[in-house]
Every structure is written in structure tokens, then in C-alpha cells.
């Protein structure tokens, strides 16, 4: 099918679709998007034999009525479409245009499927999953990454499987499904056992971060942290070593070793490259401040928060802003301004976005309870600790939930879990 044939086919396709009263979305079903059908009807895309066969069955039309047949090979054209859209998607990714990256990677995946290129299909879907994660569509990113881990390309290549599982772990952690985050992180480490250091380190970081956030004892994550430390010298990128230092620092704070945590934070600050990922670099400042505050350390915190606040207001998402506001409220609380801290965190919870059901509310609820406690409102504090405990249980932060339940019963809190790495 040449360009002229594509236009003729598209016209006949549109006519057949309208005769049956179907929309473009309905015609595509769960296999092709409405935009892809639109491109076929306008002649901007060449229909592969597989597409022609699918559409003819959906519409009850013989391919011969369209002047074509499922026979014939247009795989090359579909392959070219996949390459083109994937290049555009990757460019959109670099420009932080997540919507375009998602749209073009989806089109690339459809073209790759039509051409029978399973590897390119996996690659396009992986770009889509990354773009959804960057756009803070964490649940959607997690679901797609889980599917990619079972893709035929992932079954052929352990590196592809490890990358998909790592992304599934990270996305599940971001969407507060910590049990799943740990499970996928463990599978990623297993899949990456013989992979290059950069792939294995990503899997290890996903696993230990999920374990720490879920409240697992430091001894359980120690073997994985040791492997991560041994991998760091084998990485050629300063930025990648900075990511490891960031992870090791957070683990040190969890283990009750703030001195080591500060050392790793200083190392990460030197190695992380803001040109590589500005949002990630800003989040490091925000979470570094949070870990210090959790250990009762205020030295350097105002400067860290100032840097984070300036940049995250421009490039951060709502999840980033919640983390930042929690740290700012914690600093106010430690500095003795409990009323200001309460006002700040209440504003987070009252906001329809930052206090919405898709957000992790447990940490904010816990901080609000601590504010009431500092203000001497004991009864309100106990009730709020109970609210926080129930939410933390739902999110899988079991150690923090136990602490909150203890406080609701008037017992002292044992640990602090107000940060996310």
C-alpha cells in the first residue's frame, strides 16, 4: 500500500465505520487508540496486514472491498513510523513535555506492534511508563511497568526485565503500595544479578528504599546495602554514584546513624548533577532536610529547604510539594512555632490536590498530631494520632503506624517516619 492507497483505504474505512455507527475509539477497541484510527482514516498512516484483518473483522467487511487484502507486507512502513514516533517521544521527554512523550510513545508502540517488532514495542511502552511516572501518574506507571516485566522482550532479555521490575517497584512505592514495591524490588534484584552494575544498582536502590519506607529493620536491608556500596566504585557516572550515596544516606538515618547519614548526604551533594535531572536534584535537597529534621538536626536545613522551594515551585509536582511542606512544617515545629507548623500542614490536608485521596496522607496526618501535642491539646492529639495510624497502615508504613498507635494511647513515639527517599 502506497501513500495514494493509504488515502483511499482511509476514506473507505471512515465510510464503513460511520455506516455502523461506531466512533473511532469504539472501532479501535482495546487494541488501537482512537487517534491511531484517525491517522488511518486520514491516510497519514499505512495499515499493516494485521490492522487490515482486525478492522475488517470489526466492521464485517472483506478486505477486497477496500481494494486490499491482509496479504502483502507493509511492515517496513509501520517500523519507520515506530522509529519516528519514538524519536519524537524521547525528545519530548528531554523537554519535560510529558503529555507529548506519552502520546508519541503510545503511537510508536502501536506501530511497532503492527510491524511485528516486539523489541521496539517494549521500548516504546517503557518510554511511556517513564513519562507517566514523571507526570506523577504513579499508579498508571506501575501498572504498565508490571506488564512490561512479562513482555516477550523482557522474557528474552534480563536487562529489560530488570528495568521494568525496578520501575514497577519505584512507581508502586510512589503510589504508596509498599508491599508491592518490595516484592517487585526483590524480583528486580534477582533479574539483574548478572546485569551491568548500573542496572543492578538501580534494582538494589529500589528494593532498599521500599524496605526502609515500609519500616523493615535495618538488619534486613544490610546485605543489599553492602552490595550497593560495593557496586558504587564500578560506576563511571558521578551522578549514578551520587544516587547510591543518597540511598545509603537515607538508610543510615533509618538505622539511627545520623553521622553516617550526613557523610553520605555530603557525598551525594557533590556527585548529583542538576543538569542531568533538575527535579531529582531539588528533591534531594528536600529529602535531605527531612532526614536531618527526623534526627533532630537543624544545621543546614533552612538552606536546603530554600533551594528546594525555589526550584520545585517551577518543576516539581504535587507530591514533591507535599514533601517540601512537610519538611517546612517540621522545621517550624522543632523551632518552637507549633501553631505555624499546624497551619502549614492543615493547609496541605485541606487542599483538594495535596490532600486528595491519591496522595499519601499518613505522614501529614502524623505531623498534624505532633503539632496538636506540642500545642498542649492532648485529647485532639490522641485522636489525630489514631487517624494517622489507620492511614499509615493502609499505606504499608507499619512501623510508623505502630508508633502512631502508641501515641494515641499516650505512650511515647519510638521512631520517626516523616520522610521519603
What is the predicted function of each stretch?
Residues 18-39, 106:
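Short alpha-helical DNA-recognition segment
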Residues 60-76:
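Short C-terminal boundary/hinge segments that cap the last helix of small helical domains
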Residues 48-65, 412:
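DNA major-groove recognition helix of helix-turn-helix/homeodomain DNA-binding modules
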Residues 101, 141, 181, 220-221, ...:
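Single-residue signature of alpha-solenoid repeat helices
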Residues 106-113, 146-153, 186-196, 225-237, ...:
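Amphipathic alpha-helical segments of tetratricopeptide repeats
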Residues 1-19:
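A short, Lys/Arg-rich alpha-helix, primarily the initiator
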Amino acid at each position: 500500500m502506497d501513500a495514494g492507497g493509504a488515502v483511499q483505504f482511509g476514506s473507505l474505512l471512515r465510510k464503513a465505520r460511520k455506516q455502523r455507527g461506531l466512533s473511532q475509539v469504539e472501532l479501535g477497541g482495546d487494541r488501537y487508540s482512537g487517534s491511531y484510527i484517525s491517522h488511518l482514516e486520514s491516510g497519514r498512516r499505512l495499515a499493516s496486514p494485521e490492522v487490515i484483518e482486525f478492522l475488517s473483522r470489526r466492521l464485517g467487511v472483506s478486505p477486497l472491498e477496500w481494494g486490499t487484502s491482509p496479504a502483502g507486507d507493509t511492515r517496513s512502513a509501520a517500523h519507520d513510523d515506530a522509529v519516528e514516533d519514538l524519536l519524537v517521544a524521547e525528545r519530548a521527554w528531554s523537554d519535560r513535555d510529558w503529555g507529548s512523550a506519552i502520546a508519541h510513545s503510545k503511537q510508536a508502540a502501536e506501530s511497532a506492534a503492527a510491524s511485528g517488532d516486539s523489541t521496539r514495542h517494549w521500548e516504546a511502552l517503557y518510554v511511556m511508563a517513564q513519562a507517566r511516572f514523571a507526570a506523577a501518574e504513579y499508579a498508571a506507571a506501575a501498572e504498565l511497568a508490571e506488564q512490561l516485566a512479562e513482555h516477550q522482550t523482557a522474557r528474552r532479555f534480563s536487562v529489560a526485565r530488570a528495568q521494568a521490575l525496578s520501575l514497577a517497584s519505584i512507581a508502586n512505592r510512589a503510589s504508596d503500595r509498599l508491599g508491592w514495591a518490595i516484592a517487585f524490588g526483590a524480583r528486580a534484584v534477582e533479574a539483574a544479578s548478572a546485569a551491568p552494575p548500573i542496572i543492578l544498582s538501580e534494582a538494589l536502590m529500589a528494593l532498599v528504599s521500599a524496605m526502609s519506607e515500609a519500616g523493615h529493620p535495618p538488619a534486613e536491608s544490610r546485605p543489599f546495602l553492602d552490595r550497593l556500596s560495593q557496586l558504587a566504585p564500578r560506576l563511571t557516572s558521578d551522578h549514578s554514584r551520587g544516587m547510591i550515596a543518597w540511598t545509603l544516606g537515607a538508610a543510615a538515618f533509618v538505622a539511627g546513624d545520623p553521622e553516617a547519614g550526613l557523610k553520605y548526604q555530603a557525598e551525594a551533594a557533590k556527585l548529583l548533577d542538576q543538569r542531568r535531572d533538575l527535579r531529582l536534584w531539588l528533591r534531594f535537597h528536600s529529602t535531605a532536610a527531612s532526614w536531618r529534621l527526623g534526627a533532630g538536626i537543624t544545621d543546614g536545613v533552612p538552606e536546603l529547604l530554600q533551594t528546594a522551594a525555589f526550584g520545585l515551585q517551577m518543576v516539581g509536582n504535587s507530591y514533591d510539594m507535599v514533601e517540601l511542606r512537610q519538611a517546612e512544617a517540621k522545621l517550624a515545629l522543632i523551632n518552637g512555632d507549633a501553631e505555624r507548623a499546624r497551619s502549614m500542614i492543615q493547609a496541605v490536608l485541606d487542599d483538594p490536590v495535596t490532600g486528595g485521596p491519591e496522595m499519601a496522607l499518613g505522614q501529614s496526618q502524623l505531623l498534624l498530631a505532633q503539632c496538636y501535642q506540642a500545642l498542649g491539646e492532648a485529647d485532639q492529639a490522641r485522636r489525630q494520632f489514631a487517624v494517622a495510624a489507620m492511614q499509615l497502615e493502609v499505606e504499608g508504613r507499619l512501623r510508623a503506624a505502630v508508633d502512631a498507635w502508641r501515641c494515641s494511647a499516650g505512650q511515647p513515639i519510638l521512631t520517626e517516619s516523616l520522610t521519603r527517599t
